[in-house]
A protein has these predicted regions:
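Symmetry-related core transmembrane helices of the 12-TM Major Facilitator Superfamily/SLC fold
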Residues: 140, 155-172
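Helix-loop boundary and gating motifs at the non-cytosolic
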Residues: 1-46, 209-248
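Structural signature of the two symmetry-related core transmembrane helices
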Residues: 68-82, 274-289
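Helix-to-loop junctions at the C-terminal end of transmembrane segments
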Residues: 51-65, 147-148, 258-271
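Hydrophobic core of transmembrane alpha-helices in multi-pass small-molecule transporters
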Residues: 11, 80, 90-108, 114, ...
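Conserved MFS/SLC helix-loop-helix module at the cytosolic interface between two early adjacent transmembrane helices
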Residues: 51-88
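Juxtamembrane intracellular "pre-TM" segments in multi-pass secondary transporters
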Residues: 1, 173-219
Length: 334
């Protein structure tokens, strides 16, 4: 099968995500954290995405060693997540989340940069590659939801093991090639440093339209972060357990499949701004349905995951890959 490693890499990344993102706030709540503390802990990953993630992306682009950087991040995540078992106080959990976020925040953009580029080179529809991640996420989150009620720490051990497997799969990506800037710097010696630095400070994208695209992405991320941060806590307050959380997250993942099957047709028919406007509207409706506190309406809200998050994610990733300045693909995706 052409590009099998790309399907496996994307699938394994979303398996690692399924063993952390859906259940972590429920873990915080069970450890006695209040809403304010959960909000602080949940904000660390987005903060790392704004501050640390661009540094990792710049390192990957300037050296051209994206695969090596991704492998390093995976190994660091595998080690950092093992800090969680045994934590009890807010300070201990804060330290574990901070350490994990420093590395985890940069994994997806660099992984996407590599996988999307390879998919285009091999003539593979990225929607099909991403669908492998969706199915993997749905299967794992459903099974783990029923098991984690009595074995909560298993999510951390499983996450660590999956990051190690993810690392092995990343070794199947083509070997890193030094960027033209790095080659030029080696050829010309230390005096080329200032030239390279000036070149690195240039624009990341070829069009200013990216700012409008990023505005939509910001609105979507605002909603999705709020949703993911407090859904688990909300279910606990209503008297439900991890099993329902797993079912709801499985529904949301499966709702992405029809979108991925149709996204190329939709992209050809409608402009990016039209699709993103509809996606943000679906996210707003999703939050309204969730607030009802009714399981049936919660399930309906989860069915909007595909029309909201997946549309926004796919449009942004593919648009950025087209409009990013050559040599800055990791920074663009970050």
């Amino acid at each position: 099968m052409k590009g099998l490693n790309l399907y496996l890499i994307n699938g394994m990344y979303w398996i690692t995500a399924s063993l952390y993102l859906p259940f972590i706030t429920m873990y915080f709540s069970q450890k006695g954290m209040d809403s304010m503390q959960i909000g602080i802990l949940s904000a660390l990953l987005p903060i790392a995405s704004l501050t640390v993630q661009p540094l990792w992306a710049a390192l990957a682009d300037r050296t051209g060693r994206r695969r090596r950087v991704l492998i390093l991040l995976n190994l660091c995540c595998a080690a950092a997540v093992l800090l969680f078992p045994g934590t009890g106080s807010f300070g201990e959990i804060l330290g574990a989340v901070t350490c994990y976020a420093l590395f985890n925040s940069a994994v997806l953009p660099i992984c996407d940069a590599l996988v999307v580029s390879q998919a285009e080179e091999k003539g593979i529809n990225f929607a099909w590659v991403r669908m492998c991640g969706t199915v993997s996420y749905a299967a794992i989150v459903l099974g783990m939801g029923f098991y984690l009620k009595k074995h909560m720490n298993l999510m951390f051990y499983g996450n660590s093991a999956c990051f190690l497997l993810f690392t092995l799969l990343c070794l199947t990506l083509p070997k890193d090639k030094k960027t033209l800037k790095a080659q030029e710097q080696e050829r010309r010696g230390p005096e080329a440093d200032q030239t390279v630095k000036k070149a690195g400070k240039g624009p990341t994208f070829q069009s200013k339209e990216i700012y409008l695209i990023l505005l939509f992405a910001f609105a979507m991320q605002f909603g999705i972060n709020y949703y993911s941060a407090f859904l688990g806590v909300y279910l606990l307050e209503l008297g439900y357990s991890q099993s329902l959380l797993g079912v709801l997250n499985c529904i949301s993942a499966l709702s992405e499949i029809p979108v991925l099957l149709l996204i190329h047709r939709l992209s050809r028919r409608y402009k990016q701004t039209v699709l993103l406007t509809a996606a943000v509207g679906c996210m707003a409706l999703r939050l309204i349905l969730l607030s009802a506190g009714n399981v049936a309406l919660m399930a309906a809200a989860q069915l909007l995951q595909g029309p909201s998050y997946m549309v926004c994610y796919f449009v942004c990733v593919t648009y950025i890959n087209r409009m990013v300045v050559p040599g800055k693909i990791s920074q663009g995706q970050s």
